[in-house]
From Swiss-Prot:
Homodimer. It comes from Lactococcus lactis subsp. lactis (strain IL1403). This is Dihydroorotate dehydrogenase A (fumarate). Binds 1 FMN per subunit. It catalyses: (S)-dihydroorotate + fumarate = orotate + succinate. The lineage of its organism: Bacteria, Bacillati, Bacillota, Bacilli, Lactobacillales. Its main location: cytoplasm. Catalyzes the conversion of dihydroorotate to orotate with fumarate as the electron acceptor.
Amino acid sequence: MLKTTFANAEFANPFMNASGVHCMTTEDLEELKASQAGAYITKSSTLEKREGNPLPRYVDLELGSINSMGLPNLGFDYYLDYVLKNQKEKAQEAPIFFSIAGMSAAENIAMLKKIQESNFSGITELNLSCPNVPGKPQLAYDFEATEKLLKEVFTFFTKPLGVKLPPYFDLVHFDIMAEILNQFPLTYVNSVNSIGNGLFIDSEAESVVIKPKDGFGGIGGAYIKPTALANVRAFYTRLKPEIKIIGTGGIETGQDAFEHLLCGATMLQIGTALHKEGPAIFDRIIKELEEIMDKKGYQSIADFHGKLKSL
């Protein structure tokens, strides 16, 4: 019922973790692999290992989360070794997603060259939208720099590649970014990363709740679902059909998943809710989505995918 075709591969269902959640270590990744998730993705890596920002840097909130992790990861080679080993052992399984988030265009190019030269046959996600590294702007808000980077990438990169985007809030920005993305043989876009630089306050303590950046951090969870749905829909209606969409943001229930698929997402990433609930969330959310589809008489996701009605 939930079978999903994406990047010329078949997945049992469209659900996966969002990079950054439950994917730091090989143990985390093995737990995801053993879960009911249709696919999983590694932690966004930099060439060298990073400790990330000082603690506390992640807090669960009533309707979501705030974080300023600062891209902590165990380094590019750690994750490349894992995916290559996994690929060798489990050739028949659905491909793994490998996330990178260089601190500069040059670092992204260096990592992509290593992936291109390796035997990795999965799907690469280039994160252009981390909002939590002090002093480092989100590249995908700079349209010229994004276009320049992608032009360079596609002079040598021939494997499946997606980009993870920040949320946009202006229709003109959707138009501009879609026009740029449509020039390239991208496999997908992932919309959205957390909404950058929100602020949550503990009114009892009269204080912020995370330490980095004076308490400013990326907001995730139910708070951002309307923004995520808008971004999925805006890109679904603007991108060429070869570029698929991964919907991320506020997916906690089967209902949320249904809405993302209705807007045009093909795969779905879960972040905040996975952090709160652990990998067992996939069992629950699959069941809930199947129940909604049964109730509506849908046999497959294709029956309603992207078919959001306008008034």
